[in-house]
Amino acid sequence: MAFQDFDKIQERVNAERKRKFRKRIILGVVSVLVVAAAIIGGAFAYVTYENKTQEQGKTTNNKSKDSPTKSESPSPKPPSSAAQTVKAGQVDKIIQTLCNSTLYKPTCQNTLKNETKKDTPQTDPRSLLKSAIVAVNDDLDQVFKRVLSLKTENKDDKDAIAQCKLLVDEAKEELGTSMKRINDSEVNNFAKIVPDLDSWLSAVMSYQETCVDGFEEGKLKTEIRKNFNSSQVLTSNSLAMIKSLDGYLSSVPKVKTRLLLEARSSAKETDHITSWLSNKERRMLKAVDVKALKPNATVAKDGSGNFTTINAALKAMPAKYQGRYTIYIKHGIYDESVIIDKKKPNVTMVGDGSQKTIVTGNKSHAKKIRTFLTATFVAQGEGFMAQSMGFRNTAGPEGHQAVAIRVQSDRSVFLNCRFEGYQDTLYAYTHRQYYRSCVIIGTVDFIFGDAAAIFQNCDIFIRKGLPGQKNTVTAQGRVDKFQTTGFVIHNCTVAPNEDLKPVKAQFKSYLGRPWKPHSRTVVMESTIEDVIDPVGWLRWQETDFAIDTLSYAEYKNDGPSGATAARVKWPGFRVLNKEEAMKFTVGPFLQGEWIQAIGSPVKLGLYDA
């Protein structure tokens, strides 16, 4: 069956209906209370704010911890809240507040002060965040000019520089998108765009790191790393400022409409995300009914469809297509390199089964191809979905780094898919990703990257690699503590593949190792078979790298290797309590209501809740 393992949705329909009915009743009561609270709270906030403003006018400003004074400023339109405008003299205090949470305070303060001197006095605290993002953008221009000035005749280095240019362009594009989103937002609703800003700026950090990683170890790479240091510092500061600005705006009295806006915001966000999905398309996500499926294009190797290759179907997709574009891919092995670029958002690919419709390739690092470019399949366009498909890299263990799929599509979903490879099978590169009821197979670091990705109800199989090789399920690559990225393995099974079972004693296997300084991985409510060593986690190349700064955690795992008593004693490892584990569930970690809204099965919280 094409959809043989989809969590028995029908068994949960009645329970889901009851839950939704209860939710409607609760929301109805809450709405009445919110309206009442809005009227009372709005009046109270206004009076309190007026009194507070008068009191602040009588006090001195010699304490940095004092709240900034607010006043009316000339504006083309009335401010939407008391937080909209600030006196020019208060800008320095706000800068200090926003920069206090950063890792590089002097740089943050100098950046914002220099940027504010270039323009009219800042009348909106959000302008300071935009100034920080502009600084990253400008610095990237200068950084890449310096990179281009470096002399090299080595072909690999020249290729790495070319790749770096593409990555810098992607970073600048997402910086531009971030600034536009800030411009288009209302102050009262700034909190609603925070997850997007976090995702985009986290990706900007990843792109810069990938640029450096593209060079072989040596003098040139050291020079490249040095050049990117300034832009990475500025990116880190921008990420830190998002949270502190959100906190600052939330602490300032708002007009009474805020309560009403918040009461309606969840529904509006959901409508915005799913406006391009019809009811029929949502139903399609729950079960593949080939007869009822009416795709925009059909791919079939035997010629029974519109196209015989996936790339041909993508090439025929209309430019700037509005809505979701569905491609049905009939059973067969498709030996082609596929890239769904950023100009193709909202693409859905549906196969006949994860072991029937397979995209395959064999590019590898052993063939002198950089890891980033070895992927058989690349998903970049926002909102990509794949269902009942397989993705392979057949380079084998001798190929070393050989990626089956690289995913950087924001809000991407993979349902009942299969990912097969050895080292570096699944490159969960950037942005928010959700994998449900998938099979992932590999040896070394076979789930790696710097996305915010949750793997739920998946089977993770460790296979036999090269003699003496140690297996690691994950190698998460968070560079900076303010990135909102990390891997969560939730309600999954980690077990030996069939080829490893007879010889598993000869191959030590671990849940993960730290690829980058702030690597973050959580394994919770999962079954861990005895293939995993009791210590659980592996050092990076037998060093102490990142053991103080990483964030590895477990919660209520079972199975022969689920116990944590013998786990590593690193400062960065811990066993979570229930409240802590909740932070890494789909709801808060991926803002996962968008997954539920499109009709995909998903558990937003813990299974033991």
UniProtKB/Swiss-Prot annotation:
Q: In which tissues is it expressed?
A: Expressed in flower buds and pollen.
Major subcellular location class: membrane
Q: Where does substrate bind?
A: T371, Q401, R513, W515
Name the UniProt key words of this record, in alphabetical order.
Aspartyl esterase, Disulfide bond, Glycoprotein, Hydrolase, Membrane, Transmembrane, Transmembrane helix
The segments labelled Disordered in the record are 54-87
Gene Ontology terms describing biological process? cell wall modification; pectin catabolic process
Q: Where is this site: Transition state stabilizer?
A: Q423
Bilayer topology reads: Single-pass membrane protein
Please provide, in alphabetical order, the Gene Ontology terms of the cellular component aspect for this entry. Answer: membrane
Q: What is this protein called?
A: Putative pectinesterase/pectinesterase inhibitor 45
> Which organism does this record belong to?
Arabidopsis thaliana (Mouse-ear cress)
The gene that this protein is the product of is PME45
